[in-house]
Amino acid sequence: MQGFFVTGTDTDVGKTVVSAWLLSHLDACYWKPVQAGTEPETDSITVRRLAEVAEDRILPEAYILPDPLSPHEAAKRAGIAIDMNRLKAPACDRPLIVEGAGGLMVPLNDNAFVIDLAA
């Protein structure tokens, strides 16, 4: 499967906007494996709105965590642990745009980082 992993060094640096642009210009699918923070809307909703694509091009998140924090901290506050086995790329018959959460070295749990999703 061909794809792109979109990352950035912080929140609000443009990962979601870049993901939406790639999605629309590459006729791709989009996946945000871990969504931390849901206000005012999730990144998946924003990407779909910006890219103006059908809902089936937006693949469901493995985790949606309410607090806008690093994934490992948001998961702790939600009382769960992020299981890397749930973070396998879903099937898609198009290129896949995967949007990370923060930079590559942001922890997902006690043993894994965002870079592990990109590998």
Question: PLM ranges: what are they?
Answer:
Residues 3, 12, 17-81, 86-90:
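N-terminal phosphate/diphosphate-binding loop that engages ATP/GTP or pyrophosphate donors
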Residues 3, 21, 103-119:
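Conserved catalytic-core segment of NTP-binding enzymes
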Residues 7-8:
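Residues at the beta-strand->loop junction immediately N-terminal to the Walker
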Residues 86-109:
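Switch II (G3) loop of P-loop NTPases
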